[in-house]
């Protein structure tokens, strides 16, 4: 089983324009919350905010075989973790600005905005998240129909 940091390191070397800091600490949070049998399929980093000039909200976004996890380690103590299961996923919006890209993940309960992303990575992020979520949503619908 690959650790989150290996995926993030690969992403950062491939897309160096993404603004991100303290990656190992953020990855530790994601790794800590992986459930038994859960494996990371894809991971990337971004700032979790709507403002391109706010660069202190680095989050690690990990797509696992069961859900999407967004985690960040706070500077002094504590951390934040958001878990998005396929049944709560609604929509994904990708936008490219002059310097960076932005990904908006719309869920039943909230709208998660990820910014300061290398624009060259946007197609890869969109493809990985959308294809996985749509495939999993089909499974949820099949289960509901069987019941």
Predicted regions located by residue number:
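Conserved beta-hairpin
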Residues: 49-78
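The phosphoinositide-binding surface of pleckstrin homology
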Residues: 38-53
């Amino acid at each position: 089983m690959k650790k989150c940091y290996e995926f993030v390191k690969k992403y950062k070397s491939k897309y160096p324009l993404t603004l991100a800091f303290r990656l190992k600490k953020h990855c530790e949070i994601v790794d800590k919350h992986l459930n038994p049998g859960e494996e990371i399929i894809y991971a990337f980093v971004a700032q979790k905010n709507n403002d391109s000039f706010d660069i202190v909200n680095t989050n690690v976004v990990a797509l696992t075989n069961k859900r999407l996890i967004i985690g960040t380690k706070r500077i002094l103590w504590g951390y934040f973790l958001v878990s998005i299961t396929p049944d709560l996923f609604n929509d994904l919006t990708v936008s490219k600005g002059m310097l960076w890209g932005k990904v908006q993940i719309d869920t039943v309960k909230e709208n998660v905005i990820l910014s300061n992303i290398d624009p060259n990575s946007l197609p890869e992020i969109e493809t990985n998240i959308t294809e996985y979520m749509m495939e999993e949503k089909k499974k949820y619908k099949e289960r509901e129909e069987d019941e």
